Amino acid sequence: MHPLAIIVATMFIDDQRYTQSGKLYRRVLLRNSYRVEGKVRHTTLANLSQCSDEEIEAIKLALKHKADLKRLITAEQVKTRQGLSVGAVWVLNQLAKQLGISKALGHSREAKLSLWMVLACVIEQGSRLSATRMAKRHAVCDILQLDSFCEDDLYQAMDWLHDHQQRIEKSLFTHRYAEEGTPQFYLYDVTSSYLEGDHNELGERGYNRDGKKGKKQIVIGLMTDKEGWPICTEVFEGNTNDTATVRNQIKKMAGRFGVNEVTLVGDRGMIKSTQISDLSDEHFHYITAITKVQIEKLIKDGVLQMSFFDEKLCEISHNGIRYILRRNPIRAQEIADVRESKLTKLNKLVAKQNKYLAEHPRAQVEVARKHCLGKSQAMKIDQWATVKTEGRAVCVEVNPDKRDDEARLDGCYVIKTDLSADSASTQTIHSRYKDLAEVEFAFRTMKTTLLEMRGIFVRKANRTRAHVFIIMLAYMLAYRLRRLWYDVELTVEEGIRELASICSIEVISADGQLSYQTIPEPRELGKILLDKTGMSLPDAIPCRNVNVDTRKKLISERKKEKIQALNSKK
């Protein structure tokens, strides 16, 4: 060995178990490991075989932390405190990875902030400001490895998300159908969502579905597969007609997604002659329903007969179009009950008006009649319920023949398609049209229940579109959880709250430094929810000590509101 050679030795515990003469022995040695001319050498410093297990573990622990023995402290020298919420963020993040959402978004800072907005939407609906405040209560920075941010960073991330929406949707589409191949049937429907304020760039007054009269709105289109899995979404100006949104969806399927075989399923009024022509240009097909007026015309022309309508499906082909007919007895009874309910309401109003006329001799009977007539017209029963006067009284005369004529198509519906019988059976056509209920459920979840899209507080068009896209990505997570937890007696919202209640435990040393964060064993319900997802929480998570704070302060805003209120009283 060279006289100036440097030997670096590492001390370790050599703990071995071996069998000799049928007996199990344990040998524990305290040894040094070093290299001489490139070869590993060992020297034994002490034989610890006679030491107790506790003593051996203590020596191992000391060697493991020999560079910082101050961290080896007694139980009396530490204290614990509740840490950040871990369960919901951890599970949703893992689910986002499984569904390809994380991969589609990418690993940039904007991608991670976008992912947090998606997770936050499922955990607790709100604005970008509330999502920033949420990050102070949830271990989002530790789990997503995010640095400090404020609400302005989230708005910038929305701009980024809007610019990358098409790429992300394409990536998710590829991930979803990589193994089973692209589907043939696609469900499409639209809804509207009201806006707060008058300054949204896409906001217009149009056909309102939210019952918010006087408010501007946007129109939202959503396409799913036959199981209701969201594929893409698009936002239009609030006065856009439903049919005007279809052409863009056809272009997406033919261009961006590159699908060759498409059958678009849309409700009556969505797919009309223009849309059918657009679909035909791409060699695509359609499934839709026809209106009551169209049914009556086909009956008048002899194409259909009332006897065809039955509980069992009936199919008629005419001029290359297949018509699938059925009468739903439950729906028929519901319509009949509504009709009778309207007549009852009209009779109550008539009785009220007659009482007023009797108590007020100077009251004009014609005014009362017009009031009742307006009510019947509003309820659309004036064709068979005639409002007239007899002396100083108003009465309702029902025409049984006209009422029966209106009721003859109660519960009847007709689905039409240009698909050949070889491509899809009668039952398949009927089932795919009924699958539109999946899109309706998606809108209901996105707008009113779990995800609460309404009202929208952003102004710019690109951020409005990004907001809706975030909701769609969040619905993917909710969609998956609904199926994973289908046999657990709670809603997805309740399940998320249970997971969010799982918080880390911070272990603080005597010098006030955070040593580590452990995750406690969940309650029984939490265990069940985790088991259903096939996930388990880690024993601990890293602590990055990232400080997240809002630029806009609630206290400052409250003070401003108080000052404004005081000034308004002067």
Segments and roles (model prediction):
Residues 1-11, 58-66:
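Basic/aromatic DNA-contact patch characteristic of tyrosine site-specific recombinases
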